[in-house]
């Protein structure tokens, strides 16, 4: 699984660099999954990658001391994920729940991820 947490403005360049390195069946996990990820990573999806996106970030943090520490303001009580193709979403529910230790719900399609 390849996890991307960069701003949406970096997606196009990231997709270009990633394209020669990926294989069918690999997973690209975008957090958050909005920002046009489905368009930026279209060629990777066409190569058979699974796009997994989370509606929102799992927690919020703020800078405490520059270059030294941050603090967490809070965590979501529940996460929502979607995939392209849509029928792949169920296999990621447990993975995301274990990764973040937060209850995770699956969405019927990726459009639900983008319209948040």
Regions found by a protein language model. Give the residues of each.
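Rossmann-like NAD(P)(H) cofactor-binding subdomain of soluble oxidoreductases
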Residues: 8-65
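Internal alpha-helical scaffold of NAD(P)-dependent oxidoreductase catalytic cores
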Residues: 65-116
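N-terminal Rossmann-like NAD(P) cofactor-binding module of classical short-chain dehydrogenase/reductase
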Residues: 2-3
């Amino acid at each position: 699984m390849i996890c991307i947490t960069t701003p949406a403005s970096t997606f196009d360049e990231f997709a270009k660099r990633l394209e020669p390195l990926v294989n069918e069946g690999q997973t690209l996990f975008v957090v958050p999954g909005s920002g046009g990820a489905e368009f930026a990573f279209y060629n990777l999806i066409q190569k058979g990658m699974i796009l997994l996106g989370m509606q929102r970030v799992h927690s919020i943090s703020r800078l405490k001391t520059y270059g030294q520490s941050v603090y967490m303001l809070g965590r979501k009580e529940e996460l929502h994920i979607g995939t392209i193709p849509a029928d792949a979403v169920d296999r990621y529910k447990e993975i995301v729940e274990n990764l973040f230790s937060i209850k995770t719900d699956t969405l019927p399609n990726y459009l639900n991820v983008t319209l948040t």
